[in-house]
Amino acid sequence: GSYQLLYTRIGAHAAVDLHVEAARTADLGRAGAFVNAVLRKVAVQDLDAWVAILRADVTDPVARLAIGTAHPEWIARAFAESLGADAAELPELLAADDARPKVHLAARPGEISAEELALITGGTEGTLSPYAVHLDSGDPGTMEPVKDRLATVQDEGSQVVAVAMSRAPLVGEDGGRWLDLCAGPGGKAVMLGALAESEGATVTGIEISEHRTDLVRAATKGLPVKVHTADGRDPGLEPGFDRVLVDAPCSGLGALRRRPEARWRKTAADIQGLVVLQRALLDSALRLVRPGGVVLYATCSPHLSETVSVIREAARRPDVELLDVREFLTGADGTPIEGLGDGPWVQLWPHRHGTDAMFMAALRRSDDA
């Protein structure tokens, strides 16, 4: 009810009556009167007036932004730290989290081009992934290309991760052994499988839960992808993979625009446990990749503890070479992508690139030291 009053054009009288009636229909006793009183109080002022009241005594600029954009303060501060020298963009970033994102489709490589998919769906081609198509709205599940498995629903940033993994330069021939160490629920595995098929490669997928393993198997049906249920920290695989993707479990702070309620379900204390897991998965990947092979580490979070800190620690190893992702990450038209920062890792942003805030870094095994 408060959302309708403050964020939509529904009339105050209609919004109040609707939710009072809902309380009565649910047989909530006197709750209907309480709902009526609260919503009528909310309706007295618009959103800006309520925000002004909430931050009347708050002087810290980041805290004021957090209140005004409905973000926990710890998340706003983490984003400001991640932006670094570009921290002046924080208002745009937080506003992007509160805006409705476009629907992103991925044309399946080898089956349909982004140009064809855009013509069929009425969408527009993306600028970062050569397979991306954007739609302003709609239910993609009802679209023929999606139903026919010619396209999938996938944020363009996630597509870029898979593309980067397939393009990263190896030392020596690509023997066609690719590994997706955290494959569930299967979005990137589908893209990797299609890219692998075009390169004559195969993908091994690892997922810790049987349920998510089944999801990946269903999603990648017909592709050269074989999925196993195992713990990615010690999956029991023979080393020697040419390419390994670690799409690490993370806080998901980069996808708050798609799951706005998630910001209130997470705490700063959650991060450290995730970092321990992320480091262990990356260590496992570096054991499994062959000398000259590449590990692509990615998170859907811009939090520095989950991104740069993890990579810097791994890069201290004598057998690891940190690659500049920007050098093999060109846009859909083959030109360099703007706004990727100073490297060697890449951080995408919703307010800059129109994607979730995906982070990616590439590490190449140099030898067996």
Predicted features along the sequence, with ranges:
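S-adenosylmethionine
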Residues: 1-369
